[in-house]
Every structure is written in C-alpha cells, then in structure tokens.
C-alpha cells in the first residue's frame, strides 16, 4: 500500500520506508538527517535496513504459515458455522496481506528500483489498499454479527445469509474506496534518477487531506462503530446475567429453572465474543500507534529528531505484525489445534465412556469455529 512520503524524504532514506505496504505513513520522516554527515547516515541506515529485512521475512513466514493452518483447520470442519465463516475470511485477508503487502515490500527492498510496468505499479498499490480496508471492515462485519447473535438471538438463527451479506458489503466498500489509488500512484523517475512506484501529486501538500480521509475511513470510523457495538453487547450480557440471578434466586420449580437456563447466552457464544474482542484489541494495539503517528506527522506536530525516526521504524512494523498475530489468537482459542494429542489419549484411558462423551461435547461448544 502506498507510503505517505515526499520525494525529499526518499532521497534522505535512499530506500523505501518500512511500511511501504500501507497508505498511511510518515511525511518527510527523516528530514533531520540534513544535519548529519552523509557517511554516518549511510552506514546507520544500511545496518537498520538489514534488521528490517529480517523482521519482514519473519513476519512473512509466520503470517503465511499461521493463516494456512487456520484455513486448513476451518475448511476440514464438517460442521461449519457463521463464526467459522468470519474466521476464514479474516485468515484469507491476512494471507493476502502477507503475499501482496509484506512480500512486495521485501522484493522492493532487494531491487531498489521498481522494475515492473506502470500498470503493475497501479494494480499492486490498489490491491494493497483494498486489503487494508478489508482487514478493518471484516472486523466491523464480525462485530455486527456478534451483536445480532447476543441481542437478537432468534433473528440470528433465522438469518444465515447475513454473514455473507456483511462480508460482501465489506469487500465491496474496500474495492470502492481504493479506486483513487489507481489514479494517485504510478511509475515515475525521481530527481535522483531512481524509478519508483510513487504518488503522482502535483504538490506534497495534497498528502495531508488525503491521508486524513484515509485514516478516518480505515481506522477511526470503524473503531468507533466497533466500540459502540461491543458496548451494547457487553451491556446486554450484563443485563441478562442480572435477570438470570434474580429469577434463579426466586425460582422454586426445578423444571422451570432448567427451561430458563436453556434460554441464556451459551458458553459458546460468550467464548466467541471473547475471541472477537481479543482480535479487535490486537488490531487496535498494532494500528493505533501507526495512525496516531501519521496524523501527528501530517500536521507537523512531531519534531525532526533521531528519536522520531527510531520510533517511526518500530511503529511501521506493527501493522504487518497484526496479520501474524491473528492466527496465534485463533490457536489459543481453538483447542482443536493446540491441545496435545498425547495428553488427551492419556486422559481418555482413565475416563469412562460417559465422561469422554461429556468432555467431547464441551470441547465442541468451546471451539470458536462451532459458535
């Protein structure tokens, strides 16, 4: 995805900044280097470039392998649910992020110049931005689906097509909002003679309004929607639990109490909510520093110092980290992947048939793919 850098900052770096795979980055990120001796800066950045390449390769491998495991786990399930569908969509998005965003960044760092034709430049940039939007909007869709599962459980059971509709809208908006990228970016020769897939702005001042709009469409507005939705979900769960405590304390009919218990929010749904919240918290932790840094930088709030550059390099690694973390979160919540088989066989040998059946039923209910 396009990096928000001016040509002047590119000359200072002599390479593409870390998160070349995102449309929101830092403007004139190393202007402080004008005060440094050129030789000192060159040796400093060369060593840093090697570390960044190692980091990118690690993130790429973890992202592809981790999400491949998730896709294999969800696809081999005979009993699929709406939560399985959303987990699959998230894994698909993260996998393409690794292939199109992280891998192209690695290739670009090795080649230096952009070797492909102008059309490839525009298409690659477009797909990178599509994936950025999609990764956010899939989370919004997941939040809406969990809201309906908790607040309107009866309608939720009747609306099996809702998940596909939500994902369809998420991807449609992603492709639509990314169209300006096809116009903004193109292959160009910079004043230092290097050929790059770069923004074709008539003036660098265009970056500030453009990147501000992108930041709100990609991050701030979706985050506000997600926060409101999960606020309502938590409120609904709390109210139902309070009502449950009151009814149970006053309940004298055993059959009536059992019937009421069956109408409560299931443990499976609660675990799905926990899984969704952890995924969203990971998204917030990885992307908040990045977008906040970009907004402050676009409005010239940050000083031109070495510390600013060091911070920017670390911050620009966080978004790529998000696609590698998601499958690890799924692994933690899914006992089907992380449970040691030998331990289970040992436990099975000491259990009665009834105990094994009850444990198997609880494992099915606890897996996010069956929620």
Swiss-Prot record:
Main location: membrane
Subcellular location: Cell membrane
GO biological process: eating behavior; negative regulation of defecation; negative regulation of eating behavior; neuropeptide signaling pathway; positive regulation of ERK1 and ERK2 cascade; positive regulation of release of sequestered calcium ion into cytosol; righting reflex
The entry's keywords: Cell membrane, Disulfide bond, G-protein coupled receptor, Glycoprotein, Membrane, Receptor, Transducer, Transmembrane, Transmembrane helix
Annotated transmembrane regions: 53-73, 83-103, 124-144, 165-185, 213-233, 276-296, 313-333
Bilayer topology term: Multi-pass membrane protein
Sections of the chain in a coiled coil: none
Disulfide cross-links: 121-197
Keyword DNA damage: no
Residues in compartment: Extracellular: 1-52, 104-123, 186-212, 297-312
Cytoplasmic side: 74-82, 145-164, 234-275, 334-371
GO CC field: plasma membrane
Induction pattern: Increased expression in lung after ovalbumin induction in a mouse model of ovalbumin-induced lung inflammation.
Sugar-bearing residue positions: 4, 13
InterPro entries with a match to the protein in the record: GPCR_Rhodpsn, GPCR_Rhodpsn_7TM, NPS_rcpt, Vasoprsn_rcpt
Signal peptide extent: none
MF terms in GO: neuropeptide receptor activity; vasopressin receptor activity
SUPFAM superfamilies given in the database record: Family A G protein-coupled receptor-like
Superkingdom, taxonomy of origin: Eukaryota
Similarity remark: Belongs to the G-protein coupled receptor 1 family. Vasopressin/oxytocin receptor subfamily.
UniProt-listed PANTHER family: NEUROPEPTIDE S RECEPTOR
General function of this protein: G-protein coupled receptor for neuropeptide S (NPS). Promotes mobilization of intracellular Ca(2+) stores. Inhibits cell growth in response to NPS binding. Involved in pathogenesis of asthma and other IgE-mediated diseases.
Protein's recorded name: Neuropeptide S receptor
Species assigned in the record: Mus musculus (Mouse)
Lineage: Eukaryota, Metazoa, Chordata, Craniata, Vertebrata
